[in-house]
Structures are given as C-alpha cells and as structure tokens.
Amino acid sequence: MDLIPNLAVETWLLLAVSLILLYLYGTRTHGLFKKLGIPGPTPLPFLGNALSFRKGYWTFDMECYKKYRKVWGIYDCQQPMLAITDPDMIKTVLVKECYSVFTNRRPFGPVGFMKNAISIAEDEEWKRIRSLLSPTFTSGKLKEMVPIIAQYGDVLVRNLRREAETGKPVTLKHVFGAYSMDVITSTSFGVSIDSLNNPQDPFVENTKKLLRFNPLDPFVLSIKVFPFLTPILEALNITVFPRKVISFLTKSVKQIKEGRLKETQKHRVDFLQLMIDSQNSKDSETHKALSDLELMAQSIIFIFAGYETTSSVLSFIIYELATHPDVQQKVQKEIDTVLPNKAPPTYDTVLQLEYLDMVVNETLRLFPVAMRLERVCKKDVEINGMFIPKGVVVMIPSYVLHHDPKYWTEPEKFLPERFSKKNKDNIDPYIYTPFGSGPRNCIGMRFALVNMKLALVRVLQNFSFKPCKETQIPLKLRFGGLLLTEKPIVLKAESRDETVSGA
C-alpha cells in the first residue's frame, strides 16, 4: 500500500507553494533586527521567541541581558520588540518623545469598548481621558477616600485575626486578595463587599473571572500569530474580555450611576462618583466629557490594573518582613511612634512613615509586578544613534534593571536603606520604574501606595509575621502576565497582644 497519496503534479505543486507562502507569512517580520544589526535569540516561524517566555519573562530577559547587554531584539510571535537598557534612551522613549513617537502602549487584540480605558486608549483619546481623570487622583481627592479604604483595613484585620486564631499558617494572597477586591470594588463601583466571607457575591465571582488572563492562552496566541484576526473578531463582537463578565459590570455601573443621580444627598467620594461629577463639570469644557461607555471602561480597568498588583505587592512586603525580623521590628516601632495605641492611620500620618516607605520601595524594586514597560513606535525614528522602525514595540525590562549589579549593590538582598533620604537621590529614575515614568506612567500610583500603606499600618499594628515550615524560602516565581509566586506565600501570624497562631 502506498504511504504517499497518488496526487497529480499540480496538486503537489500547489501544496508546496502553499507551505512556502505559509512559512513566508510566519517569518515575514523575523529578519528585521538582523537587517538592523541588532543581536537577539533566533525566532521560530509564527511563534518567534514566545515559547521561551514560558520560563518567565524575568528569566528570559535576564538571559538576554547577560548575553547581549545594552540592546537586543526579540519577536513575540509576529511582533518585533526592541529591548533597551540605557537610561538616556529610556528617558527619550518614556518622556522626551512620549507625545510625538512613543505615546501608546502595545495593543493586545480585540477589546471592544474597553479601547476607551485609560491604559488601552491611544493618542488624542488617551490624552483627553488622562486629562479628565487626573483631577480624580490628586492628593486632596485621595485624602477624602481614606475613610473608605480604612474601613476595609479594619475588615482585613478582623479576617486576619480569624484566620490566625485557627492555629494554622495564613495564606497571604487569601486575605490580601480579599482586601484588594473590597477596596477596588468599593472605590470603582461604590459596592460594599466583604469578599473573603462572601465568595458567592456576583461582584466577587465576576471580577475573579475577569482576572483570569494568560498571555499563552491559545486564543491570545492565535491573535498574536495572526494579527489580521483582530478587526474580524472586533466586528463579530468577540473580545479578550469575557462577554458575560463585561455585561454584568456595565449593567452594574449603569444601575449604580442612575441610583446616585436620583438621590439628593451628598454622595461619598469614590472614583465612580468623581467620574460622574466630571461628566457634569463646567471645567470639562476644554475636553469632551467622559461618555457613559468611557466611564464604565475606566471602572473595569481599575479592577484589572489594581487587584492582582496590590494583593501581590502586599504579600511580597509581608514575606520580606517575616524573613527580616529586624526590619519588621523597625517598621512596627516607627508605626507605634507615629500612631500610638493603635491609632487609626490618616493620609497625613501615612506620609510621615519614612521607613515604611523605604520598605515598600525596596520590595517594588525586588518584585516589579509588571516586569516590563512597553511603548509602540509610531513612526521611523533615530534615538541615540539607533534607528527604530515604525511598528516596533520598544520594551524596557524593569525586572532586569531592578536587579542589575551595575546600579544596585548586592541586588538580590532586601535592603530598605537603599531608599533612605541620604541614598534616594543616587537612584536613577529611569532605572527604577515600578510604576513606569513620564506622561504615561501609572495614573493610580499614589492611590496604590496609599492603599497599600494603610493596609500595612493596620496589619503591623496588630500582628507580627514569622516563616513556618510551609514557607518557601527563597521564593520561586512562576510564569504569568504579572510577577507571581510558584507557591502561595504562607506565614505564621502572631497577635502583638498575644500569640494567636502556631505558637
């Protein structure tokens, strides 16, 4: 029996031509960096270097930096990406040429009306939305939001005490994930939830579904391999965000907004109310006010941007304090001095906690949750003698720069003193970029820092943390869109009044 089908010569020829054309399509961008004389790892047809990302962006970027040093070119499937590590070049990309060339973040497939969200919007639309939202994140507005956040700090302490009193070690992501969820749903949607004790709440269920995003998901990969699918999927109303979840959240925002507009009494200050106010503000005459669809997109993106990042960083901070008891005691002493007798923290008192600020900054250096910053090159440009073609994504490997011995003595060590007043001025702002830099940095940076510090103060006023036999030391990281641990961080929590866990 013939193993090879008896096909006509024309059929074989057609098949061969089809395979050649398919190969050419799958490698059409892969010669760019070689042509430009930029080194980098060899890409595979269609997938580029994407399979190497499975070991973790941080590992792959570290390997490339050690091998190629200053710049290198990689391919995320079909997308050429230029990694840069020179602080002058980084400043040019993030600041000097932000508005003219490097305005936009990298698009990631069909997003539907979420294209209006501040972290996804492009060019003039992004500038307009950023201008409208910036007043929402002023220190004055954040100060007014502190009572809402503080309320969930108290819930966090109660939940942590309940977990600790079982005598079992505490899984930090469990309690900090609930805190992060509560604060974000409260400030973005005006919804009060104790999510740890109400896991069936539709807001909790839907927001958790929204956050299950995997960069190596077959659907996401197919869009990267065949980018022409994006407009087709957009036309079919298929997006990377789960349809049912988006439908639930948009309906919720609409109902909450309508309810608030009907009420006559003064509303509490949260992001949702501030955005509603901006729609009716006379000050918005210079820019077209936020539409209802844009308002919904911001509320949803706040969850996407804030939930995982806040809960992960809080977990990393407490882990570092547990494994460095001298630092933990020093932080607690500072908190007890500024806020005696467990006095509730305020916006102003949190800003007085200099050593706590050093601890937070050092943890963000060791664990920059986003790992990379990315900007799309809008037109052919030359920067510091290097030609960058239109369409290339310029990538700044934050994790690599945060761990580079060229800039940090003993970079793998947890040393909060790096960020003391004396040393802080020596830190290059284009090497240390936990929230990005320039006009398109993280708009919620101040909110995130205040939110985390309020939680840390309440927790450290009431508890001390120690490693236990289940604690993974040193921490191992796993692949994900953000910096995640291989195993959940588990610690022993002890009440500062009396030992309540695992003693």
From Swiss-Prot:
<dbReference type="InterPro" id="IPR036396">
    <property type="entry name" value="Cyt_P450_sf"/>
</dbReference>
<dbReference type="GO" id="GO:0070989">
    <property type="term" value="P:oxidative demethylation"/>
</dbReference>
<dbReference type="InterPro" id="IPR050705">
    <property type="entry name" value="Cytochrome_P450_3A"/>
</dbReference>
<dbReference type="GO" id="GO:0020037">
    <property type="term" value="F:heme binding"/>
</dbReference>
<protein>
    <recommendedName>
        <fullName>Cytochrome P450 3A7</fullName>
        <ecNumber>1.14.14.1</ecNumber>
    </recommendedName>
</protein>
<dbReference type="GO" id="GO:0042573">
    <property type="term" value="P:retinoic acid metabolic process"/>
</dbReference>
<dbReference type="GO" id="GO:0062183">
    <property type="term" value="F:all-trans retinoic acid 18-hydroxylase activity"/>
</dbReference>
<dbReference type="GO" id="GO:0004497">
    <property type="term" value="F:monooxygenase activity"/>
</dbReference>
<dbReference type="GO" id="GO:0005506">
    <property type="term" value="F:iron ion binding"/>
</dbReference>
<keyword id="KW-0560">Oxidoreductase</keyword>
<dbReference type="GO" id="GO:0005789">
    <property type="term" value="C:endoplasmic reticulum membrane"/>
</dbReference>
<dbReference type="GO" id="GO:0050649">
    <property type="term" value="F:testosterone 6-beta-hydroxylase activity"/>
</dbReference>
<keyword id="KW-0492">Microsome</keyword>
<dbReference type="GO" id="GO:0006694">
    <property type="term" value="P:steroid biosynthetic process"/>
</dbReference>
<keyword id="KW-0444">Lipid biosynthesis</keyword>
<keyword id="KW-0256">Endoplasmic reticulum</keyword>
<keyword id="KW-0443">Lipid metabolism</keyword>
<comment type="function">
    <text>A cytochrome P450 monooxygenase involved in the metabolism of steroid hormones and vitamins during embryogenesis. Mechanistically, uses molecular oxygen inserting one oxygen atom into a substrate, and reducing the second into a water molecule, with two electrons provided by NADPH via cytochrome P450 reductase (NADPH--hemoprotein reductase). Catalyzes the hydroxylation of carbon-hydrogen bonds. Metabolizes 3beta-hydroxyandrost-5-en-17-one (dehydroepiandrosterone, DHEA), a precursor in the biosynthesis of androgen and estrogen steroid hormones.</text>
</comment>
<dbReference type="GO" id="GO:0008401">
    <property type="term" value="F:retinoic acid 4-hydroxylase activity"/>
</dbReference>
<keyword id="KW-0752">Steroid biosynthesis</keyword>
<dbReference type="Pfam" id="PF00067">
    <property type="entry name" value="p450"/>
</dbReference>
<keyword id="KW-0479">Metal-binding</keyword>
<dbReference type="GO" id="GO:0101020">
    <property type="term" value="F:estrogen 16-alpha-hydroxylase activity"/>
</dbReference>
<dbReference type="GO" id="GO:0042572">
    <property type="term" value="P:retinol metabolic process"/>
</dbReference>
<comment type="similarity">
    <text>Belongs to the cytochrome P450 family.</text>
</comment>
<comment type="pathway">
    <text>Steroid hormone biosynthesis.</text>
</comment>
<dbReference type="GO" id="GO:0008202">
    <property type="term" value="P:steroid metabolic process"/>
</dbReference>
<keyword id="KW-0408">Iron</keyword>
<dbReference type="GO" id="GO:0008210">
    <property type="term" value="P:estrogen metabolic process"/>
</dbReference>
<dbReference type="GO" id="GO:0101021">
    <property type="term" value="F:estrogen 2-hydroxylase activity"/>
</dbReference>
<dbReference type="GO" id="GO:0006805">
    <property type="term" value="P:xenobiotic metabolic process"/>
</dbReference>
<dbReference type="InterPro" id="IPR002402">
    <property type="entry name" value="Cyt_P450_E_grp-II"/>
</dbReference>
<dbReference type="InterPro" id="IPR001128">
    <property type="entry name" value="Cyt_P450"/>
</dbReference>
<keyword id="KW-0349">Heme</keyword>
<comment type="pathway">
    <text>Cofactor metabolism; retinol metabolism.</text>
</comment>
<dbReference type="InterPro" id="IPR008072">
    <property type="entry name" value="Cyt_P450_E_CYP3A"/>
</dbReference>
<dbReference type="GO" id="GO:0002933">
    <property type="term" value="P:lipid hydroxylation"/>
</dbReference>
<dbReference type="GO" id="GO:0019825">
    <property type="term" value="F:oxygen binding"/>
</dbReference>
<dbReference type="InterPro" id="IPR017972">
    <property type="entry name" value="Cyt_P450_CS"/>
</dbReference>
<keyword id="KW-0472">Membrane</keyword>
<keyword id="KW-0503">Monooxygenase</keyword>
<dbReference type="GO" id="GO:0008395">
    <property type="term" value="F:steroid hydroxylase activity"/>
</dbReference>
